[in-house]
């Protein structure tokens, strides 16, 4: 595949602005995209993530949680992990390199989407161009293909909307947080709407030596080419340069008893992510009942890092061992999707049918360097004292190439879905998808190569019953597949004659629940009960540890309850509680009977907001997380915690000023972990002040 060069100017401005202003003289009907009415209501009443059609949430036979990012940014939240904190049975990881999330006990770090397009590269995502985040829980292969064992995370971006106001936002706070962002909108003609989100953020951290800088440039255009044809084009450039932070180690089964500001990296460490995406969506109304859509997504990531991180605690010397890695990573993903959606009736039955064709092409080129010792047999990277680390002790030897791979992935899929309305009480959702997936990895160091071809058929079935006007009961069953090489995009080429089983892993879910509206439809709740099984989990052959078999079993069972909406008057609520048991049931690597790492048995959140249309307003909330294990062998425990946050503000027609206080009780807690040596402390008490001017 030829090299593809994407730059902010050439793609962002030339595609959007030049096209828009070149057609400024054309007068056609107004774009159909319009602004949301009630911005204070935390509910999202309609979603396309679950069905890829505009479907009311209450008629989706699967749990789905939506979070509006505006309320989160007031607390200084600008990353995905923090944004999803408190969602029932969702936990965020602590990998400093990229976003890491577990949904219902299963890793979803490669199940991220942007406006329904796969975005699975390894980086930390910016939320300033995002309207809301939707978490679809359970297998989603019918519409999204591979992965998604516990669910998917879809970011819904800010769209150009006719008549939308512009705004400028400035923010400052603890640890030298300072940022300025602009959200600018204009309608050069009746049929063209433009929007530009851009900004810059700088911050230090309560963690010694940690800092970061974010940059964002995201123009978009909606162009009503004809009364029946709309073209939406979106571009985003994001850069995040930061200090990699691997937290603190575990000691004697608990996080080390050191200051939460203690760090063990090298002063020269850095991570520099530069991401670009270009998305195009053409929507053609064939008639009143049928629509044809074509969506193209191009994603490019350039990521470099130099990271010295802790690997273990040594009690005999009261020291922390370390290793150093460098990486140059480039990824290029191209996805093309064509869908036909329409409605019709047969024998009194109403159908909403969706058919689709999806083509994907992905390239990944990681080159990894490892530290070597200055003297033969010596220690490559100096260890540091646990309590008083001297980060000036650096690795001074050379870096040697330890891995240099090139991976190509080609995916093809067709799918069909029918939302069938039997009568006023009963609805059926049925879908089927067929995927072909091919991954080819070349090891440039060893001059070896291996390709794996796999295919899978993924079904989905749901039943919705509405015996009462405000209460909908549902039951669903779904299945997904995870092919070899479909996670981090790549496989490890083996020697000729390898007998590893590289067939896809398979996951199935059973879920029942009830979705209700209360208080004259002001408050919405969802109660869900589920069982999720990865029933051919990869594990080692007990007779030969070098051979991989598909004989393991991982299971998650749980209950979730969410509530969002308006209680009375100007009082709003959002929150939920999750209970789950996520364990490895069968395994040959010593994990059998162990809880899945970094997954709590229970978590909850509750935020109550008082927000009149104008004047003073306030919000307060609690986030509760139970204890978790830092590792798969369950040797180090992260204690459960509760965090109390609050916010107060004052708004008029054009101005909105608010101040947020995070972790009011200044409680020491541990947010997550990636291993026994890498546990991330939670943020201490901090303040964030935000001012927004709208015009």
What are these regions (language model features)?
Residues 28-163, 480, 512:
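Acidic, small-polar-rich N-terminal luminal/periplasmic segments of exported/outer-membrane proteins
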Residues 128-131, 142-219, 225-229, 276, ...:
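Outer-membrane beta-barrel translocator/receptor signature
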Residues 278-301, 322-442:
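Face-selective signature of the C-terminal outer-membrane beta-barrel domain
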Residues 281-297, 301-307, 472-474, 503-569, ...:
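Membrane-embedded beta-barrel scaffold of Gram-negative outer-membrane proteins
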Residues 522, 528-533, 550-633, 665-668, ...:
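Gram-negative outer-membrane beta-barrel transporters
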């Amino acid at each position: 595949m030829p090299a593809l060069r994407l730059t902010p100017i050439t793609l962002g401005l030339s595609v959007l602005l030049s096209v828009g202003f070149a057609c400024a003289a054309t007068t056609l009907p107004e774009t159909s995209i319009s602004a949301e009415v009630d911005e204070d209501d935390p509910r999202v009443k309609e979603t396309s993530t679950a069905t890829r059609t505009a479907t009311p949430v209450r008629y989706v036979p699967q749990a789905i949680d939506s979070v509006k990012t505006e309320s989160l940014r007031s607390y200084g939240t600008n990353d995905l992990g923090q944004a999803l904190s408190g969602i029932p049975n969702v936990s965020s990881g602590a990998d400093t390199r990229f976003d890491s999330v577990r949904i219902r006990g299963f890793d979803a770090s490669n199940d991220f989407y942007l406006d329904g397009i796969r975005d699975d590269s390894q980086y930390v995502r910016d939320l300033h161009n995002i309207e809301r985040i939707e978490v679809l829980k359970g297998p989603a292969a019918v519409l999204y293909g591979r992965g998604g064992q516990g669910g998917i995370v879809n970011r819904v971006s800010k769209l150009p909307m006719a008549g939308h106001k512009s705004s400028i936002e400035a923010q400052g706070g603890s640890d030298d947080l300072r940022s300025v962002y602009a959200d600018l909108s204009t309608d050069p003609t009746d049929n063209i709407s433009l929007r530009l989100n851009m900004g810059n953020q700088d911050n230090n951290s309560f963690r010694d030596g940690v800092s970061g800088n974010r940059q964002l440039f995201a123009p978009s255009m909606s162009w009503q080419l004809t009364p029946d044809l709309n073209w939406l084009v979106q571009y985003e450039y994001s850069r995040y340069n930061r200090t990699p932070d691997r937290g603190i180690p575990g000691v004697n089964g608990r996080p080390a008893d050191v200051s939460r500001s203690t760090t063990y990296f090298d002063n020269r460490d850095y991570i520099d992510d530069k991401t670009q995406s270009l998305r195009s969506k053409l929507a053609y109304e064939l008639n009143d009942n049928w629509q044809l859509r074509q969506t193209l997504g191009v994603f490019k990531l350039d990521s470099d890092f130099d990271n010295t991180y802790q690997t273990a605690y040594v009690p005999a010397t009261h020291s922390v061992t370390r290793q150093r890695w460098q990486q140059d990573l480039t990824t290029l993903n191209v996805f093309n999707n064509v869908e036909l959606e329409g409605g019709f009736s047969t024998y009194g039955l109403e159908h909403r049918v969706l058919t689709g064709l999806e083509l994907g092409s992905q390239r990944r080129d990681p080159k990894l360097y490892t530290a070597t010792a200055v003297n033969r047999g010596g220690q490559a990277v100096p260890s540091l004292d646990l309590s008083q680390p001297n980060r000036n002790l650096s690795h001074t030897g050379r870096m040697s190439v330890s891995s240099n791979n090139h991976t190509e992935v080609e995916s093809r899929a067709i799918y069909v879905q029918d939302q069938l309305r039997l009568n006023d009480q009963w609805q059926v959702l049925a879908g089927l998808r067929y995927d072909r997936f091919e991954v080819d990895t070349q090891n440039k160091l060893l001059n070896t190569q291996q390709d794996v071809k796999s295919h899978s058929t993924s079904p989905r079935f749901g039943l919705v019953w509405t015996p009462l006007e405000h209460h909908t009961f549902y039951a669903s069953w779904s299945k997904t597949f995870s092919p070899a090489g479909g996670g981090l995009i790549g496989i490890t080429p083996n020697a000729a004659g390898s007998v590893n089983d590289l067939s896809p892993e398979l996951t199935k879910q059973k879920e029942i629940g009830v979705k209700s509206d209360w208080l004259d439809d002001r408050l919405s709740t969802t109660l869900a009960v589920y069982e999720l099984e990865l029933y051919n989990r990869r594990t080692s052959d007990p007779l030969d540890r070098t051979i991989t078999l598909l004989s393991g079993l991982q299971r998650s069972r749980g209950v979730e309850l969410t509530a969002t909406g308006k209680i009375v008057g100007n009082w709003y609520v959002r929150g939920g509680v999750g209970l789950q048991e996520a364990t490895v049931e069968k395994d040959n690597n010593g994990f059998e009977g162990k809880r899945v790492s970094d997954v709590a048995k229970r978590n909850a959140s509750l935020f109550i907001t008082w927000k009149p249309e104008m004047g003073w307003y306030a919000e307060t909330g609690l986030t509760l997380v139970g204890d978790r294990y830092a590792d798969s062998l369950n040797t180090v425990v992260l204690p459960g915690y509760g965090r109390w946050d609050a916010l107060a503000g004052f708004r008029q027609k054009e101005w909105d000023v608010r101040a947020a206080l995070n972790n009011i009780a200044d409680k020491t807690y541990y947010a997550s972990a990636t291993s026994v040596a890498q546990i991330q402390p939670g943020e201490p008490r901090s303040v964030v002040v935000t001012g927004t001017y709208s015009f």
